[in-house]
A protein has these predicted regions:
Chain B
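A structural "domain/chain start" motif
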Residues: 3-153, 163, 265, 269, ...
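Generic hydrophobic, helix-prone segments enriched in Leu/Val/Ile
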Residues: 29, 59-66, 194-200, 246-254
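Phenylalanine-focused residue identity feature
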Residues: 29, 63, 133, 171, ...
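Generic detector of ordered, mature protein regions
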Residues: 58, 62, 150, 154, ...
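Surface-exposed short loop/turn segments
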Residues: 131, 135, 139, 143, ...
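Short, Lys/Arg-enriched charge-dense amphipathic segments
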Residues: 179-189, 251-257, 294-297
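Short secondary-structure boundary motifs at beta->alpha junctions and helix caps
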Residues: 222-271
Length: 259, 312
């Protein structure tokens, strides 16, 4: 398992799907461990009832069907597919609605889905997904990217306490890939994936959605910064180490560490 | 119960994973190893395959390919210089020409080390006429590489017409520049590879120039981020004396490589605004943090705009 995870952080994130399927065929006994520890870019399906796209993950899957957050039904149709309780479904509907607006404001497009289900204890788990195609043939408004994909997976465990607070544990993964291509600079390709965790105890006075939303917004901004400043900065630093820019025009690279 | 069933099925599937499939998987991982990391990938995949015979087959197929593709440089056993592992200098699968010192290094691909060294035979070297051009270019290119790359290694090979001994014929030289930085303790590795082909054409009295530069960088401290770039160049110049050609060709290489580096810097500068913004903005279109406390407002607005038939 350790060797498998080491391979996953060495192989290019652009090839993670092939790498994971190879590891799954090699290590069938570890399939659930691998699937839970390795994230892949999200797949999209269409809810033919509401004619809206939704995102697929392990959390809305049952057998070969996936539950749409819009109509609360499975596609392809599935009898007796598990559904969230009425109370959680209400929260799920609201979360999907609000998260769509959040997504529109930050992503100017893209697809989002939120799934909520009962936890083993008295709490619940919510999974917030976002996928954006920022390429010029997709929803890239500025049209600078030949290829540009962003996938965000936020899984948040919520455990309400007696005293009107709740414990929130958030695990977020961002996967992205961008490519530009033109005559002077050729092809320029950056791909990355990072995962971070964060836990907070918060008062539920303003509601779970408000707390979860703020945590996700904060985490997404941190991860985005980290990718842009630290991780991409490190690759740039490497280029400058291999072949330093001529003196005088050297652009200073801030020393930075990952969060 | 269902899970147990699945696992049994998958275990059955594993039994059917043939030796060839296992080897292919090993080859795939080794072939996709980032620069400087193939030995780590090899260690992992050897553990996962659990069959040394299959691993050895995969390794002996993948390492030479990887070493050549990444223009691996190895120090010569007598420490007189380095040999570049490239198809242009390949005599057979374990022997590579080092044209500057006119020696042939024996290479252990899997250990990534030179194990022997012998003088090159006359057959393996170009004619004195060609050597004049090759040598002059090597000298100029070395000066350029020393000034531009802190750890660059270069070599010039004759890849066509090496036995020509009088003017009036076509021949090709290939210049290679390979620079790499391996820093696994800092979780980063990277390489710069340039391949410049010069076609000396007698009928037009021109030298046609084709260049290819590839850069790779991997940073993997608590994450996995990879850069890969590639660009190609075309140019030409006048066929002159060996010395004049060498200066002229090196100037052209310098010009294209410097320009390329500048365009890379420009790409990095545009990253935050023009590229990243099309994925996710730093702040919402409203330029203020999302009003989570006031989301009820959104629902009302949305219902209202729906009723009024505006908005989405």
């Amino acid at each position: 398992m350790e060797a498998a995870l080491d391979l996953m952080r060495r192989i290019s994130p652009k090839k993670s799907e092939t790498a994971l399927s190879a590891l799954l065929s090699l290590l069938p006994h570890y399939s659930s461990d691998l699937l839970s520890q390795v994230d892949l870019p999200l797949q999209v399906s269409t809810d033919t009832t509401s004619m809206k796209d939704f995102l697929l993950c392990e959390y809305n899957r049952d057998a070969d069907s996936y539950r749409s957050p819009w109509s609360n039904t499975y596609f392809p149709p599935l009898e007796d597919g598990p559904l969230p309780s009425e109370e959680l479904r209400k929260l799920e509907v609201e979360a999907n609605e609000v998260f769509s607006i959040y997504r529109d404001q930050y992503y100017e497009g893209g697809i989002s889905s939120v799934y909520i289900w009962e936890d083993d204890d008295h709490g619940f788990v919510a999974c917030f997904l976002i996928k954006k195609d920022g390429s010029k043939t997709g929803q890239g408004k500025r049209g600078n990217l030949q290829e540009g994909s962003w996938d965000a997976i936020h899984v948040i465990e919520v455990n309400p306490e007696e005293d009107g607070t709740a414990h929130y544990c958030l695990t977020s993964t961002i996967m992205l890939s961008l490519a530009t291509e033109n005559k002077t600079s050729g092809t320029f390709n950056l791909a990355g994936s990072i995962r971070r965790q964060m836990s907070l105890d918060l008062s539920v006075e303003e509601g779970h959605l408000c707390n979860m939303g703020r945590m996700i917004e904060d985490m997404e901004s941190k991860l985005r910064n980290s990718l842009e400043q630290v991780y991409f900065g490190k690759t740039r630093e490497m280029v400058c180490t291999l072949r330093p820019p001529p003196e005088g025009v050297q652009i200073c690279i801030p020393e930075s560490r990952p969060i | 119960m269902a899970d147990c069933g699945d696992e049994a099925d998958e275990a059955g599937a594993q039994a059917e994973l043939s030796d060839k499939e296992k080897k292919d998987i090993a080859v795939w991982f080794l072939s996709n190893a980032p620069v400087g990391e193939i030995s780590y990938v090899a260690k992992d995949i050897r553990t996962l395959i659990g069959d040394d015979r299959l691993y050895d087959m995969a390794a002996s197929e993948s390492f030479p390919r990887h070493n050549k593709a990444h223009l691996l440089t190895l120090e010569l056993p007598d420490r007189s210089g380095d040999v570049i592992i490239t198809g242009y200098g390949e005599i057979d699968k374990n022997q590579y020409l080092e044209p500057r010192s006119a020696q042939v290094a024996t290479v252990d691909h899997i250990k990534q080390a030179c194990t022997g060294l012998r003088p090159a035979t006359d057959d393996e070297l170009p004619s004195p006429y060609i050597e004049e051009f090759r040598y002059a270019l090597d000298v100029e290119l070395c000066k350029y590489v020393a000034e531009a790359y802190p750890k660059g290694i270069s070599a010039v090979y004759c890849t066509r017409g090496k036995d020509i001994d009088v003017p009036g014929n076509d021949f090709d030289l290939v210049a290679i520049i390979s620079a790499s930085k391996k820093s696994p303790q800092n979780f980063c590795n990277g390489s710069w590879r340039s391949i410049w082909t010069f076609e000396f054409k007698d009928d037009t009295q021109l030298v046609d120039i084709k260049g290819k530069i590839q850069i790779a960088a991997h940073y993997f401290e608590e994450g996995n981020v990879q850069l890969s770039t590639k660009n190609e160049f075309n140019d030409s110049t006048v066929f002159q004396s060996p010395e004049d050609c060498a200066v002229q060709l090196t100037n052209i290489v310098r010009h294209h490589e410097s320009e390329y580096l500048q365009s890379l810097e420009a790409s990095y500068l545009h990253l935050p605004d023009s590229m990243f913004k099309d994925l996710r903005r730093k702040l919402p279109v409203t330029r203020t943090l999302f009003p989570w406390h006031n989301t009820l407002q959104f629902s009302i607005n949305r219902d209202l705009s729906k009723e009024l038939g505006i908005g989405k």
